[in-house]
Amino acid sequence: MDDIVNVYNYHNDLSQVLVYADSVIAGLENKGRQGTAANYRSARRAFEMFLDGSPFSFEELTPEVLDRFVTFLRERGNRPNTVSFYLRQWRAIYNRACADHVVFSDQKPFRRLNLKEEVTSKRAISREKIAQIECVDLTACHADMQLARDLFLFSFYTRGMSFVDMCYLNKENLQGNYLRYKRQKTGQELQIRIEKDLRVLIDRYASPLSDYLLPMLRNGDRYQDYRRRQRRLNKLIRELGDRLQLDMPLTFYVARHKWEYHKNSTINI
């Protein structure tokens, strides 16, 4: 009987990091914020593996523990940006716990960690490779291959717009010669001037039957449908990179990091 009570108490003790993370994830899912919930769930899973079944409270979360967590992740082959991703999710969860008065400590365990994502030259492909992607003839390929290529270019032309933000663009975001939208992840408002190449893509996918600018979502789509399409388009953009014999895997992140890497160049983009 005592064991049952202890298990019940554990699963209702929000001072336990995994229990609190579960409550945050459930709340996000109820609000329809499936992407953030998925990110937190991934970070939670990694930390649960690190704990190896041991209970762990927020009071025990110190810089030294986080250092061990980083070592644990690296020893399992996680790349620096993956490690940084997990730490950023846990910092966000920790900050929520502070705001909810679950954590009362002022030790700031994340203060000395470098949580910035690296922009690597490996991802920042040359402008000549971008031109190859722009000019490749895909008329004999499935229409989804052209869509994957066009989404890659759309991201590049819009200064690295994320996949999820492209998905949710609608006609109200078109305001004259500008594209104005809020980032799904942060709510930050952005404005992008619509130049010729971007206008071509917008016009190509314009449809009176959809409120969206690009054909990834339909009205009423579930998050799972969005993720399934994202996986397919990710697969196709990698296949396009192989087709062009690029010296690196082609992903939508490449378009985003290409912009970051070259944003101070003199190339007219």
Predicted feature residues:
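Short alpha-helical segment immediately N-terminal to, or the first helix within
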Residues: 73, 154-155, 169, 262-266
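Short, charged phosphate-coordinating catalytic segments
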Residues: 95-104, 155-176
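Active-site/catalytic core of tyrosine-dependent DNA strand-transfer enzymes
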Residues: 130, 195-247
